[in-house]
Amino acid sequence: MAREREGRRRDEREERDTEFVDRLVHINRVAKVVKGGRRFGFAALVVVGDQKGRVGFGHGKAREVPEAIRKATEAAKRGLIRVALREGRTLHHDVAGRHGSGKVILRAAPQGTGIIAGGPMRAVFESVGMQDVVAKSLGSSNPYNLIRATFDALKREDSPRAVAARRGLKVSALQARRRDAEPGSADSADAA
């Protein structure tokens, strides 16, 4: 009975692991100075996502690279966040985030734009399942700061449902305002 339960848990864990895409962002060789000299190890930064709106990042350290990557992947799966995507492909609104001296600005983009972002930010967007986004990083280009700043920005992003609940409005009222505000829409052309 217990053996059967253990096998079932392992199957569920393996099934859960297959739904995630992991991207290795950065590997760093680190040294610890000891009495006999230096001990070398590795630090890995990994981003994990299901390409449906969930994403997380993790940092792992070990004496060997594969072990550091495994630890980082496990840490990333423990810290997943959910990101609300518009039409399953982009952000609902422009948003900025920062961590330390790293700053990022994320902008929603029209369909067909693609992911216009550099380095570590691209790994986050691919893992979360975004297809159209424009991102700019300012300040520090340290991958750890950029990843954390990107996650800060993604946490600040709200879905229309959350904004409507906060303002005490209906979602349809918000979306009507959005259509009125979009340049080139039929309603705004009639008003001009």
Curated annotation (Swiss-Prot):
What are the S5 DRBM domain coordinates in residue numbering? 20-83
**Cellular component GO terms held in the UniProt record:** small ribosomal subunit
- Indicate yes or no for the key word RNA-binding: yes
Under Pfam families, the record lists: Ribosomal_S5, Ribosomal_S5_C
Q: Which GO terms describe its biological process?
A: translation
Molecular-function GO terms, alphabetical: rRNA binding; structural constituent of ribosome
List keywords of the entry alphabetically.
Ribonucleoprotein, Ribosomal protein, RNA-binding, rRNA-binding
Q: Where is this region: Disordered?
A: 165-192
Quote the PROSITE patterns the UniProt record gives.
RIBOSOMAL_S5, S5_DSRBD
- The organism's superkingdom is given as Bacteria
Q: Which family does it belong to?
A: Belongs to the universal ribosomal protein uS5 family.
Whom does it interact with, and what assembly results?
Answer: Part of the 30S ribosomal subunit. Contacts proteins S4 and S8.
* Known function: With S4 and S12 plays an important role in translational accuracy. Located at the back of the 30S subunit body where it stabilizes the conformation of the head with respect to the body.
PANTHER family according to UniProt = MITOCHONDRIAL RIBOSOMAL PROTEIN S5
Task: Name the HAMAP family on file.
Answer: Ribosomal_uS5_B
Q: What is known of its domains?
A: The N-terminal domain interacts with the head of the 30S subunit; the C-terminal domain interacts with the body and contacts protein S4. The interaction surface between S4 and S5 is involved in control of translational fidelity.
Query: What is the protein's name according to its record?
Result: Small ribosomal subunit protein uS5
Q: Which gene underlies this protein?
A: rpsE
